[in-house]
Amino acid sequence: MNIHEYQAKQVLAKYGVPVLKGGVAYTAEEAEKVALDLAGPVYVVKSQIHAGGRGKGHFKEPSAGDKGGVRVVKSTDEVFSNAKQMLGATLVTHQSGAEGKEVKRVYIEDGCDIKRELYLSLLVDRATSAVTVMASTEGGMDIEEVANHSPEKIFFQAIDQATGISGFHCRNVAFSLGLEGKQVGAFTKLLSALYKCFTETDCSMLEINPLVVTGDGQVIPLDCKMNFDSNALYRHPDIVEYRDEDEEDPMELEASKHDLNYIKLDGSIGCMVNGAGLAMATMDIIKLKGGAPANFLDVGGGATRERVTAAFKIILSDPNVDGILVNIFGGIMRCDVIAEGVIAAAREVSLNVPLVVRLEGTNVELGKKIMVESGLPIISADNLADAAEKVVKAVKEAS
């Protein structure tokens, strides 16, 4: 689960992380009121959307001006005018997709005297099975760009969860960033607090970009992004309250209500599969045969007819879907249940795209019989390669 920048800073503040004073606003009037409570005379107006690259982004609407989604201003009047331009406008960034995201709230924050910009993040490294600190002197840039062009500028520090973070971990990272004197002590306190926050909130990624060193030597997170493990949210009702469903994909949101693992992609062939590994293999072979998957969808091993029907409806709600491939290996999941769910959904939504079904496993013959007797134009496949070839061919012929 993702949260907004201002919410992330609220979480960090609870752990003693120094953050600049600021407040969220939903109208230009509220934005000006927040600014009046800040020290000034420099303020930063920040669009709040679940996408990175806001500062380098652009708005679709000419009325929003030609500046990005993060603007430095020098008066409360400018706070008002810029907030008015941004609120309700559509911000497009390299992470939002071409459709962009509507700005429904802005964060007004005190400006600061920036001497250096650094990069810092904590994440779970599956290669080392440890929480790992990633740091770079190239703050303010996309870390992917740094990794591609200057990988030597990224420093990694793994932390064994059995022992937790220690002073030497913090000093290693501080020295890699070129910090010195009192800055090292300030950074040690900061990183220790970030690690505690990361582990106690079941965070999956905590990114600060940039982490700035101010003119008076303070080390402060200027921007912050936090993602949380959705499987652990039941332990954090306070974090769940930060969820902004308006920022989530409508289809992914609907899928979550039915305990379906769904991720929207850019292709035209919808996929419904049981098991994450088989789902990824299915997407791979669709690409291999010349198609492009429209989604990742794992219905799980214990799906009911109703759940399968819901999955089918979600796939068909994507206007980009020109064909569907159902690939089921029935172990715990029975093939007859899948067949009944697919047929029920196809009839309910008036299926008008090619449908290829590959069934194997428990009750497979019964499942195939149910589909044949349904009278629906379902294309049966014998194996995964055959299924991928048939759905790609059917989509091309139908277009």
UniProtKB/Swiss-Prot annotation:
One Pfam entry name: Ligase_CoA
Binding of substrate, residues: N274, G331, I332, M333
Gene Ontology molecular function: any one: succinate-CoA ligase (GDP-forming) activity
Catalytic reaction annotation: succinate + ATP + CoA = succinyl-CoA + ADP + phosphate; GTP + succinate + CoA = succinyl-CoA + GDP + phosphate
Any single Gene Ontology cellular-component annotation: cytosol
Superkingdom of origin organism: Bacteria
Entry cofactors: Mg(2+)
InterPro entries with a match to the protein in the record: ATP-grasp (IPR011761), ATP-grasp_succ-CoA_synth-type (IPR013650), ATP_grasp_subdomain_1 (IPR013815), Succ-CoA_synthase_bsu_CS (IPR017866), SUCC_ACL_C (IPR005811), Succ_CoA_ligase-like_bsu (IPR005809), Succinyl-CoA_synth-like (IPR016102)
Domain ATP-grasp: start-end pairs: 9-254
Biological or metabolic pathway of the protein: Carbohydrate metabolism; tricarboxylic acid cycle; succinate from succinyl-CoA (ligase route): step 1/1
Chain positions recorded as Mg(2+) binding sites: N209, D223
GO terms classed as biological process: succinyl-CoA metabolic process; tricarboxylic acid cycle
Keywords associated with the record: ATP-binding, Ligase, Magnesium, Metal-binding, Nucleotide-binding, Tricarboxylic acid cycle
Enzyme class: ligase
Binding site for ATP: K46, G53, R54, G55, E109, C112, E117
E.C. no: 6.2.1.5
Gene3D superfamilies: ATP-grasp fold, A domain (3.30.1490.20), ATP-grasp fold, B domain (3.30.470.20), Succinyl-CoA synthetase domains (3.40.50.261)
Cofactor annotation comment: Binds 1 Mg(2+) ion per subunit.
Quaternary state and interactors: Heterotetramer of two alpha and two beta subunits.
Biological role: Succinyl-CoA synthetase functions in the citric acid cycle (TCA), coupling the hydrolysis of succinyl-CoA to the synthesis of either ATP or GTP and thus represents the only step of substrate-level phosphorylation in the TCA. The beta subunit provides nucleotide specificity of the enzyme and binds the substrate succinate, while the binding sites for coenzyme A and phosphate are found in the alpha subunit.
Similarity annotation: Belongs to the succinate/malate CoA ligase beta subunit family.
PANTHER family to which the protein is assigned, alphabetical: SUCCINATE--COA LIGASE [GDP-FORMING] SUBUNIT BETA, MITOCHONDRIAL, SUCCINYL-COA SYNTHETASE BETA CHAIN
Protein name as annotated: Succinate--CoA ligase [ADP-forming] subunit beta
Organism: Rhodospirillum rubrum (strain ATCC 11170 / ATH 1.1.1 / DSM 467 / LMG 4362 / NCIMB 8255 / S1)
Lineage: Bacteria, Pseudomonadati, Pseudomonadota, Alphaproteobacteria, Rhodospirillales
Gene coding for it: sucC
